[in-house]
């Protein structure tokens, strides 16, 4: 198995090992004794940290990594991190042991601990089946390399995703012949698919003739080199680009054609919409589109087959490599002159709107400059970070302010989890830093998200494996997303009247201190606006010196409810 993972380009094993892994440990030790070190093994005290780190590592490097967990219980503890990797379509290889299948010592690896009886469950794979592209149990060690190759082939084929392999100790203890030849090249990922030429011409014609064309995307920028294709097409036709709930940086955010982060503000009067690499371009109940609007869905997964109830009223759903499709569309615009007055008018209108949106954000920042708030924190960071720094955003209800006040322009400098399970930021920052050790990594998170991410385990790992990063906690003392949804549904309800919401956990805890206790990190707390800039500078200096730092920014609490 390790041979095959090495052949497939895996460089890091994020592991939480148990009694099902003695042969893995023995194999790694044997390799080390022979001076063969193809992997960096990162021991993670919690499975959430292992998988979030592997996810972000793949997002930054473009190469899938491997996660090892302990039988059914370790698989379950992956929890929401598995949801995120699945929804983000990130390639990750997961291996879990299975409880031994012999009772009386019939084979090497037979049961020898009471826990192994309790871990014998009817269908371990049912825990992950809804969240993986492929799952398989190793039935003989003789074809385990083929199983790894098969899993990695599927993980890397668009739409990419998580694969899960499991094996019992008896199988993993089988003795095989010496190292096998590298056969990974015989198991390549799918080649990218293109639009039919006639459809490319149709979409190009629709774009060129539209009064207001808009493109909406969330994860087009998952490969940073692709962003240039989107910029080129947008500039060619004067098309506004909306990053709806972005997972990556998809379009330079200071570009005049960047139309913000809420498609609902832009598409209601659009007559042509390209939905490109986006799962949720808008919420149907809160938007009214033009009855004559033309919509094309361009995606590796245009029908969102893993989402039971989903719909975009498109006239064509195009299952293609989106970057290749945009290049085809632009090539089909050869009839459009470079000085077309319609394009110039669209570009001017978009630029005017862009300036207005920026002015609105600046005015909001100025109004609240004397207080601690997400805008002021993000703006302060914007003045301190270099262009190559990677920002991991898990601020949830503050994300819009972070996006507007901490704009990133360089592809590969912004990440989000891609799913809806909180707790990605800490482990994700470790993976990002290990994938890009020369770049600064900054995690922006809420206090709820910070705690979901198991910060004690995060900072143990970050310290041991020299992956320092800065965490900035937007600490409002609770779960603001839950509060906001309550107020939307029950604006005049009883809960709203007396602030009895059961979503607050106060601001008494020393959240930054967890980093100091677990990994020797620098722990700072900001309580006054004038402390913000100097403490953020101090924290960034610590990170540059090889030490994690956590800055706990105390925002106004979302609820004053007593326990």
Name each region found by the language model.
Residues 166-170, 218-219, 394-398, 553-556:
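Short, well-ordered beta-to-alpha junction loops that form the rim of enzyme active sites
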Residues 1-9, 16-29, 351-438:
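Active-site diphosphate/adenylate-binding microenvironment
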Residues 142, 292-395, 497-500, 523-563:
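Phosphate/pyrophosphate-binding active-site segments
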Residues 271-281, 343-344, 500-508:
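Extended, charge-rich low-complexity interaction segments
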Residues 1-336, 384-387, 459, 468-471:
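N-terminal alpha/beta PP-like core and its mobile active-site loop of ThDP/TPP-dependent enzymes
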Residues 54, 128, 381, 511, ...:
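Structural element of the ATP-grasp superfamily
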Residues 76, 119, 198, 224-225, ...:
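Residue-level recognition of alpha-helix initiation/capping sites
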Residues 105-118, 267-269, 310, 319, ...:
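Thiamine diphosphate
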């Amino acid at each position: 198995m390790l041979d095959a993972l090495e052949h497939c380009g895996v460089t890091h094993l994020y592991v939480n090992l148990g009694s099902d892994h003695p042969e893995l440990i023995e194999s790694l030790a044997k390799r080390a004794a022979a001076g063969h070190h193809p992997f960096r093994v990162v021991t993670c005290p919690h499975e959430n940290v292992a998988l979030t780190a592997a996810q972000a590592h793949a997002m930054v490097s473009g190469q899938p990594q491997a996660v090892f967990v302990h039988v059914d219980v370790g698989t379950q503890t992956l929890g929401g991190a598995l949801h995120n990797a699945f929804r983000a379509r990130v390639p990750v290889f997961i291996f879990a042991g299975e409880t031994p299948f012999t009772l009386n010592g019939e084979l090497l690896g037979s049961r020898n601990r009471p826990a192994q009886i309790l871990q014998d469950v009817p269908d371990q794979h049912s825990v992950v089946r809804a969240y993986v592209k492929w799952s398989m149990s190793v039935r003989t060690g003789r074809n385990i390399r083929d199983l790894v190759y098969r899993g990695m082939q599927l993980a890397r084929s668009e739409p990419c995703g998580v694969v899960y392999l499991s094996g019992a100790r008896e199988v993993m203890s089988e003795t095989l012949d010496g190292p096998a030849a590298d056969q990974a090249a015989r198991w390549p990922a799918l080649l990218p698919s293109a639009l039919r030429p006639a459809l490319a011409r149709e979409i190009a014609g629709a774009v060129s003739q539209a009064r207001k064309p808009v493109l909406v995307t969330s994860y087009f920028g998952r490969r940073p080199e692709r962003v240039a294709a989107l910029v080129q097409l947008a500039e060619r036709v004067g098309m506004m680009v909306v990053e709806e709930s972005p997972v990556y940086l998809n379009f330079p955010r200071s570009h005049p054609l960047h139309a913000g982060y809420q498609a609902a503000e832009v598409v209601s009067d659009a007559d042509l919409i390209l939905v490109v690499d986006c799962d949720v371009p808008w919420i149907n109940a809160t938007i009214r589109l033009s009855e004559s609007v033309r919509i094309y869905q361009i995606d590796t997964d245009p029908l969102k087959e893993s989402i039971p109830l989903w719909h975009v009223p498109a006239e064509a759903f195009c299952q293609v490599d989106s970057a290749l499709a945009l290049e085809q569309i632009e090539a089909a615009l050869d009839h459009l002159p470079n000085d077309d007055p319609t394009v110039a008018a669209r570009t001017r209108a978009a630029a005017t709107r862009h300036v207005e949106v920026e002015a609105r954000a600046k005015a909001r920042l100025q109004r609240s400059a004397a207080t601690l708030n997400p805008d002021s924190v993000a703006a302060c960071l914007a003045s301190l970070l270099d262009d190559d720094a990677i920002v991991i955003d898990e601020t949830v209800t503050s994300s819009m302010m972070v996006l507007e006040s901490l704009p990133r322009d360089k592809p590969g400098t912004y990440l989000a989890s891609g799913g809806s399970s909180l707790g990605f930021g800490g482990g994700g920052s470790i993976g990002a830093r290990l994938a890009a050790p020369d770049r600064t990594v900054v995690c922006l998170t809420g206090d709820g998200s910070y705690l979901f991410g198991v910060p004690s385990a995060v900072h143990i790992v970050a310290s041991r494996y020299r992956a320092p990063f800065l965490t900035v906690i937007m600490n409002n003392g609770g779960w603001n997303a839950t509060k906001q949804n309550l107020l939307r549904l029950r604006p005049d309800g009883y809960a709203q009247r007396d602030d009895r919401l059961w979503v607050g956990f106060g601001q008494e805890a020393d959240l930054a201190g967890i980093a100091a206790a677990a990994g020797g990190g620098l722990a700072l707390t900001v309580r006054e606006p004038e402390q913000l800039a100097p403490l953020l500078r101090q924290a960034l200096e610590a990170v540059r010196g090889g030490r994690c730092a956590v800055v706990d920014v105390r925002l106004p609490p979302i609820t004053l409810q007593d326990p």
